[in-house]
Regions:
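Active-site proximal loop and beta-alpha junction motif in alpha/beta enzyme cores
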Residues: 1-69, 74-183
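Single conserved hydrophobic/aromatic residue that forms the stacking wall/gate
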Residues: 182-190
Length: 190
């Protein structure tokens, strides 16, 4: 059996940069085989896209398990679709089992991804997250899968050195750390 595999670096225009993902357009249905291929690829995610009737179905696998949603592997899949599968297309829609329809639109220079919105709720577990991050966030929220920590200073986020072992003890897939920043708006005169 021969299965073409595309390796794509998302979020970059340079080789060997960005966030790599493997992309496979095929009729595979065997979850165990898909898991073995993802383990062999040994990238954070491998996306499998299958055309069924007029729709594309997508599944994502890490080297160890199937996952519910992956942004960079979806963007990588759209890149392959636009450049190798249907060069005339301007939209790439895929159906995900747990997240419904996901859409990527081709722009002049970028791909635009429309993903489901998470419903973040305030969390009071500041002591635990302070242990993980070494600093206390201004605000902390818990989404379906991730924690969202908000800081008042961009340099705190840039210089953060989380303890990932401690982070694993939280009931979360990951942590999103962001900061408030000040924007300088251009002056427009007529």
């Amino acid at each position: 059996m021969s299965i073409p595999i595309y390796y794509v670096d998302a979020f970059t225009d340079k080789l060997f940069a960005g966030n790599p993902a493997a992309v496979i357009f095929s009729d595979l249905n065997d979850s165990k085989l898909m898991q073995n291929i993802a383990a062999e690829n040994n990238l954070s995610e491998t996306a499998f896209i299958k055309k069924e009737n007029s729709k594309y179905l997508i599944r994502w696998f890490s080297p160890s398990c199937e996952i519910d949603l992956c942004g960079h592997a979806t963007l990588a899949s759209a890149f392959v679709f636009f450049n190798y599968i249907d060069k005339e297309a301007n939209e790439f829609e895929v159906e995900s089992i747990k997240n419904g329809t996901l859409k990527v639109v081709r722009g002049e220079e970028f791909l635009y991804l429309d993903f489901p919105r998470d419903n973040y709720k305030p969390s009071n577990n500041f002591m635990g997250i302070e242990e993980v991050l070494g600093i206390r966030p201004l605000e902390l929220y818990k989404g379906r899968d991730d924690l969202l920590a908000i800081f008042n200073n961009e340099s705190l986020v840039k210089n953060m050195n989380p303890d990932f072992i401690k982070l694993c003890k939280f009931n979360a897939r990951g942590l999103i750390a962001v900061s408030y920043t000040h924007l300088t708006l251009p002056t427009i005169s007529c």
